[in-house]
Amino acid sequence: MNTTTYIGDCRISFFNISSQGFWDNLKSPDVVFGYSLPLLEIQIILIFFCIVMSHMFLRCIGISQIASYMIAGIVLGPQLFDVLEKSSGKLSVDPALDGIAALRCISVFGTLMFTFLMTVRTSRRVAFHSGKLPVVIGIVSFFAPLFGLGFQNFFSDNIDPHYMPLTKALGERTAIVITQSSILLPSTTYILLELKIINSELGRLALSACVINDILGIFSMIVASIQATYIHVSHATAYRDTVAVIIFFLVVFLVFKPMVQWVIDRTPEDKPVEDMYIHAVIITALASAAYFVFFNMKYILGPLMIGIIIPEGPPLGSALEAKFERLTMNVFLPISITFSAMRCDGARILSQFNDIFFNIFLTFLILVIKLVACLAPCLYYKLPLSESLAVSFILSYKSFADFVLYEAVLDDTYISQATYSFLILYSLLNAGIVPTVLRRMYDPRRKYVNYQKRDILHLERNSDLRILTCLHKPENVSETIAFLQLLSSPNLDFPIAVTVLHLVKLVGQINPIIVSHDKKLKRLNKDSYIHTANLAFRQFVLESLESVTVTTFTAFSHENLMHEDICTLALDKTTSMIVVPSGRKWTVDGLFESDNTAIRHLNQSLLDRAPCSIGILVDRGQFSRKSIVTSKKRYIIDVGVLFIGGKDDREALSLVKRMKNNPRIRVTVIRLVFDHEIESDWDYILDNEGLKDLKSTEDNKDIDYIERIVTSSVEVVKAVQLLAEEYDLMVVGRDHDMTSQDLSGLMEWVELPELGVIGDLLAARDLSSKVSVLVVQQQQQRT
């Protein structure tokens, strides 16, 4: 059956839909499968049972869930259960409709919805705003594999006429070249998300090149469909279809697009789009599929074009995602992929191996050509070899999205069942092998490895202090400005360069973007919290008498990949410290309110990857409020540094030393000394060197220095709790000398491991103090 006639399968049925159940006929209970609904239900149950069982084993070896969908289809195919063949004769009441028609309709609907939603979530700006390299890769990777058409006549004398007539066999080779030359956006996006590199520069490059390639592919698909109609149907029909496509484009761009913009404009900010408009968009996407089917083209082209028109992100794109993504991704897409794989017949590959051997050779030849076509521009533009190879493998990845093309050419009888089965198995091998190869080949954390010191301890005395601050919510603004006020001063000897990064969870789109607020940002209006925050930082710069410079950015990113944007920006701005909120929220009275798990996970990722030092700020409210009052009145803010020892404590001390010129704060360094410390230990020597200027009253007049002797972990806890009552802000290192039994015993009770032992004590829920905490970790040296 032709792919383009799937939507036409919805017709009046002349058989019963629902049965009376198994108990209606105990002698022949399988008669229940002569009814369409029970048959469909058992097919879906079998599909998801096989998916779950497959994934139980595959996830143990790190294989993605998409491979489980494919394997489930192969298990249910002719090799084992042959569900399609056994189902096709069940609805004998009406032989015109076999037992797989309903399942096929669900499969096509899943493909249609997935394609539409994926296109809606893809930013069209990413294709033309990433420089020349992705454009070159997209164009070269589209045209270069087509040189494989020059090999289609090789060994044509060996084609068995019993397998396929000569003309048709050559057409099969052409279909293989065209399908293998394509780079489909869903496949590229999926592997980037699976590898968690979609936020990286390499991920953005691959996405941009893929979008360029897809744009060329859409137009070539339309031209190919019209050409096929011109050759195989009639000239008049081809001309009619051409006019129909032109009319469709005009209606979409001149009518539908303005209507979509009108819906977006009339939807108030932070208000959902009315359901009426969402349903109208979905109906339009379905109608566009039927429109293209009627005019002899692939049904997938309609939803593609409608999806391109709809702007990604809120309000409409995010509303469509919220309403339909889970159902599509968790129900319809697995059925669609499994159904396509169920048509794979491995026995045909073996029995007709000699007939399809050249097709297999052609497939791998196109793979090599595509790898070279992607690799060459990357090397020409001086991309490292490992990253160039990674881009090439990503753009050569074949997966579930390609099933649409394979089914189309199979149903149009351009390829044989044996060739189709090989292409399905080839995609399965891709899904299992390519991600594993890429993980070994490209580690995104490698680019954060710094061979230069990027911390505060090793900064020259009067050199710039570069800080990157991250904001998640409106309440983060006041605490961040309060912290920066401690470092700023009218008589400052060193300038401070602050980069502010607003982190926004990506909804309704795939492509992460970082936007500079030096440029005009249309997506923000004057009522948004980001706009208000930017005004607050601008006022802070004016109050600091321009001793501080502030640059602001907004990162629209996936929640579990935000660390990529933060680390990349920190590298670009050569920052010495990243300051992030802790995720723990307090009431106005200083009582515990909630923990944000997503922010905590982000902070942990930053601690593992950050290319510089990092500070985690826990604000109980009093510190930020007092800082605001202090800027207007002559109140003093008490800052305490708890020093136990180790590189993180030395980094915290270096940070606080840069606050000593601020007349509005009073700094005290409290050193906890253990009675059994080894004075010959290297860390102990470095600690004393860092504290030497504080111990001398002649050299140090701005910072108070206190030493307290402790003998056990119990005394450490008591000392920390007492100190928390005396200061507005405590600055502590994250890690200390954990070989000491006095601290290692406390690790068992830590609730927030990202804050370390002392930071966790000061941020404890049951601590009655209102002290805020800054936990500092010095830049980690990795190899």
From Swiss-Prot:
Gene3D superfamilies: 1.20.1530.20. Signal peptide: none annotated. GO terms for biological process: potassium ion transport; proton transmembrane transport. Keywords: Antiport, Ion transport, Membrane, Potassium, Potassium transport, Transmembrane, Transmembrane helix, Transport. It is a multi-pass membrane protein. It holds the Pfam family CHX17_2nd. Its main location: membrane. InterPro entries: Cation/H_exchanger_TM (IPR006153), CPA2_transporter (IPR050794), Na+/solute_symporter_sf (IPR038770). GO terms for molecular function: antiporter activity. Belongs to the monovalent cation:proton antiporter 2 (CPA2) transporter (TC 2.A.37) family. CHX (TC 2.A.37.4) subfamily. This is Cation/H(+) antiporter 10. It comes from Arabidopsis thaliana (Mouse-ear cress). The gene is CHX10.
